[in-house]
Design a protein with these regions (language model features):
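Short amphipathic alpha-helix that is part of the acyltransferase structural core
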Residues: 1-29, 144-148
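A conserved beta-strand-loop-helix scaffold within acyl/acetyltransferase catalytic domains
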Residues: 32-41, 47-49, 54-72
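Acidic/histidine-enriched, beta-strand-rich ligand/metal-binding domains
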Residues: 69, 78, 101-103
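Short, basic, low-complexity termini and linkers enriched in Ser/Thr/Gly/Pro
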Residues: 132-148
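Conserved acyl-CoA
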Residues: 85-100
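Conserved active-site alpha-helix within GNAT-family acetyltransferase domains
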Residues: 98-102, 107-131
Length: 148
């Protein structure tokens, strides 16, 4: 049976870190860093028979803005619609219904998010960013090289 929970005490932090340490967008993230991100976010775990198989989180002020991050389903459970179940749970979560602007970044899952109303930025020229540390890009670049 598939369930989605926002109960942080149910999250399997080592499972999260084991996955996140090897993906391009968070390569090298430590257990402590994963715990810090969980503590500072509105989190969703997806479970198959009470075993965690995926995760996503939102950084939010609960009124104006939410940023979706770290969305994943464990590899052996992909292709079964679980990511749609997870994103649907986030989009319909009662505590997040006032949020007016949702954003995320993806290089390969546009099809998933489009089902929930996400589009490309209307005015990307108005967006800015500041990168304080390129730790993840350096680790990510190395990870990509090792995958070839």
């Amino acid at each position: 049976m598939i369930t989605v929970s926002t109960d942080k005490s149910k999250l399997d932090i080592p499972f999260l870190q084991n996955f996140l340490k090897d993906v391009y967008w968070t390569a090298g993230r430590t257990l402590e860093e994963v715990q810090t991100t969980v503590d500072a976010s509105f989190c969703f775990g997806i479970y198959l028979n009470d075993q965690q198989i995926g995760f996503c989180r939102a950084i939010t002020d609960y009124v104006v803005f939410a940023y979706v991050m770290d969305v994943f389903i464990a590899e052996k459970h992909r292709g079964k619609g679980y990511s749609s179940i997870l994103i649907n749970a986030m989009m319909t979560e009662p505590q997040l219904q006032q949020v007016k602007i949702w954003r995320l970044a993806t290089s390969d899952a546009h099809f998933l998010y489009q089902k929930f109303g996400f589009t490309s930025l209307a005015h990307p020229e108005k967006m800015m960013e500041k990168i304080v540390s390129d730790q993840y890009s350096v680790v990510s670049d190395q990870f990509k090289k090792n995958q070839k």
